[in-house]
């Protein structure tokens, strides 16, 4: 997950790390519940939930508070919607709140600092509902643990089917990826695995898992199966893209089943795969992995925000490496001084020990000072976090700038002038014979387009899709204001619907020269949107592609923080892409560019 979030396409299937964690969590939690029932014939939900709070809350809440405080100090885009992010994460409903606000998990350049808390929310919701179901069946209805396994498998199948049915190929998959209903199968597969590996010993201090019974008695078979299972899982990490249809219609659940095989082999502690996971470094990374996961996203965003004006601060591999170092240090400190004491002694006893370190008769001056610094730092973080949440902004600096440009654009085009009757056969020197229709990327380049083509008619707005173009073109035609050259700048907010771009081109007509910008960005649909421009330029003699994508890909450091919108010199690059396309038209030599970056 860390590599996936910080280094983009280096590990396309890195998001599967969450599903590994889901299967493992479902397995461990259900093992605890079943083991307690086997030796005591009851399940203490109160004690179970107290243990979960002790395990999860210290790291989760401390990271929230500290990072919210840092975000408040840094300010800017990391502070956007901080209150909503904070409270939805603290209450473990982050996934549903993000779904409600149409936040895309797969638009990595706009990932909020607490977006990754979605998986923690799914787990916590499972930790509330699943123990109730297990307790009802085992304690009240007196069913067997094997029935729990069958029910878990049934639930996993239903959840996976829901994901496969609801997912809409070619559209953002965040809904099914974030949804507890559609992404619970990993947790349930882990639960099913627990039901067939749990020990039947009635001794309280007996083994949790039965190594000579159930599934685990087949140690040699498990060790042999684990080798290809691990190989396939590694292959998935490098191959299974987050927008592939197969991912949501078999990929994620098959990965979860593979992980279950690996876990069974590791628990049986037999074979080469189990030996790999006995490595001391991997074991320690496992201990701090929870905090590492919580810290890596905000740490990276803080680094990017603080140093985005430096050239090195725009290079993902540099900021990513720095973020990993910071996250490892923060995770280690959290594990040693926050998570472990509270997990061992509880909140009250940990507070008592801290108080003794400060005020106890045997405490040294150094211990008192160190002990006093902890609550002082906690109070300070809470104050700054509260101020940051209270002063949260509801839009990024880029969004505010685009709103300003949009207001200017609307006022400037209040009166549309009729198109000139003179037809030029060379690259136009001004914009009196050019209409430009587009989205926020064109809007961000408005000033440079007007500078290069004085008199150009620009109609660009934020969040605009191809869907808005037909009505605008019809309106221009009705006013006799559709000019010889028409610039189209779409694709940022989605590819055209089937046949939509053809409809737009035909409505403009073959007597007009159409130049379409090749869109750029990290959105899941971007390559499809680019391919549509390429296909249109090849299909229609009067359509040319403005290769904005190639320029943006070579000058990412010149883009805004979202790495989509141009700023400064990049607006010149955007404008020059249209100029280059017009030169192709004037020379009669069309050169249709490929999509960028190249399809894998």
Predicted regions and their residues:
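Structural motif
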Residues: 484-487, 513
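Cell-envelope and extracellular/periplasmic
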Residues: 487-491, 518-519
